């Protein structure tokens, strides 16, 4: 996967501005180009036209203002970062226009929040629908970029999504520290205790599961990268959501790369772990939206 073409969907909010600047950092690092896209909602435009029938120039004025604002944003990004940036204004249904534009990009980049809490409820719904339907990786930017990504966390569950998420992490970052993490549990541990299996035997069983997971992580890393020393591995017992958020804090992660964790119904659902991380993490989250095979 290349990162030659990055699409930023912007609503002119501060968070969308952070997303645009993160895209510029990635574009400058990878030699790519970014496009800023603003979608004017067709229903909103129709309502404006109906409301101001006596002012036929209102629609044209709005369109011109949006184009000028977006063009200036692209020019500022190019001047500040050196990244090639262009802009485009579309009119239509927001979700459909973004999805259509993303088909010609290598990655879709979004800000985490909108301008205000009420609007954010709507944007949040749009973002989740995008994650369900988009065929490109989706980067959700949560804070202003501070240079290149330096500490990347990749949670894995050994599903087919794990390898593609790890591959994605290596392509997005050039010199970052990458930590691959897995949370495990002990099957039937409670029943083993009820069956009077000794604590020592259960602990031995737990250690075996942990070692097996470590072996799988190292095999996974070797399948996508030649240099094992570029990666760290973490295998701990517990809930994956808690482990991911704890490791984010401990490692000072500035990016989490995670799969959508779907299966046959992945077009209808975003996995609960992925949704939880998107909601509760402090750092940026890159979601691999590819289908499991």
Residue ranges and their predicted role:
Residues 54-68, 199-212:
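A short acidic, glycine-rich active-site loop
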Residues 1-2, 22, 41-44, 49, ...:
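Structural beta-alpha unit
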Residues 125-144:
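Short, structured interface segments
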Residues 6, 100-101, 145, 152, ...:
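Structural alpha-helical scaffold elements that stabilize or flank donor/cofactor-binding regions
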Residues 112, 139-168, 185-229, 241:
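Conserved N-terminal glycine/acidic-rich loop preference
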Residues 1-54, 151-200, 230:
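Small/aliphatic-rich secondary-structure junction motif
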Residues 35-37, 86-90, 139, 179-181, ...:
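General small-molecule cofactor/ligand-binding pocket signal
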Residues 110-129, 148-149, 255-280, 290:
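Glycine-rich, Arg-bearing micro-motifs that act as flexible, cationic patches
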